[in-house]
Structures are given as structure tokens and as C-alpha cells.
Design a protein with these regions (language model features):
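Secondary-structure transition/hinge residues
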Residues: 1, 37-40, 111
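Classic N-terminal secretory signal peptides
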Residues: 1-19
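Residue-level marker of positions within ordered structural domains that often coincide
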Residues: 6-7, 33-34, 108
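Compositionally biased, low-complexity repeat tracts
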Residues: 13-14, 26, 81
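Short N-proximal segments of mature Sec-exported proteins
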Residues: 17-69
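Compact alpha-helical subdomains of small soluble proteins
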Residues: 49-111
Length: 111
């Protein structure tokens, strides 16, 4: 899916907590992608996680561009964060669950 840069900028600016660092955006992208993958898209919860993952993925790509990272490097960072997120969430790590909750709270509702 390709979204116009203006749409991505609007999405990124809508974060209730304001702008975030590249590292934080990648962490949220990884956690929400991992949670979405683990939940599946069949349930309302899974769809909400998918929306949050989409938002954070776009925000991370936008933040990466602003930080001078290539799109490939930003994608690789998200992949690593997702793999780590799957490990942590599968192990029911309290810190990962808390971080996921915060990421979801900061993502705008896309429905």
C-alpha cells in the first residue's frame, strides 16, 4: 500500500502524545505488528491491532526519512523490532505488555 506523504504526515502528527523519536516509533511498530500477528485479523481486537500497527509502521518510516535513514534500513529495523516483539509478547513479558498498551493509547483510531 502506498500513501501520499501528506497523509503519512497527518497520521504522524495525530499521535495523542505528540511527536516521537525514531527509536520509539520503531519499537511501537514492532510491538503492534507482533501483537497483530499473534492475535490474527479475525477479531475486533485483531483489527484494532492491525490499525495500530499500520499507523506505527507509517510513523516509523516517516521518522526514519526525517532522520536520514533509507527506507530499507527503516524496514529492517521494524522487522527486527517485530521479531523481538513476538518473543517478548509470547513470553508474556510485563514490560512489553505495558509498552504495547502505551503504543496503542498513542495511536489514533483509524476506523
Amino acid at each position: 500500500m502506498v500513501l501520499a506523504p501528506a497523509v503519512v504526515a497527518v497520521l504522524f502528527a495525530q499521535s495523542p502524545g505528540g511527536l516521537v523519536s525514531y527509536e520509539e516509533a520503531v519499537r511501537c511498530a514492532g510491538l503492534t505488528q507482533a501483537a497483530s500477528e499473534l492475535e490474527g485479523a479475525e477479531s475486533p481486537e485483531g483489527r484494532a491491532l492491525y490499525d495500530a500497527a499500520l499507523y506505527w509502521s507509517l510513523a516509523a518510516m516517516r521518522a526514519g526519512t526525517a532522520a536520514g535513514r533509507t527506507s530499507q534500513a527503516a524496514e529492517n529495523d521494524q522487522t527486527r523490532a517485530r521479531i523481538e516483539g513476538v518473543r517478548q509478547l509470547s513470553a508474556d513479558a510485563p514490560a512489553a505488555r505495558a509498552a504495547l498498551r502505551q503504543c496503542r493509547e498513542r495511536a489514533p483510531k483509524l476506523d
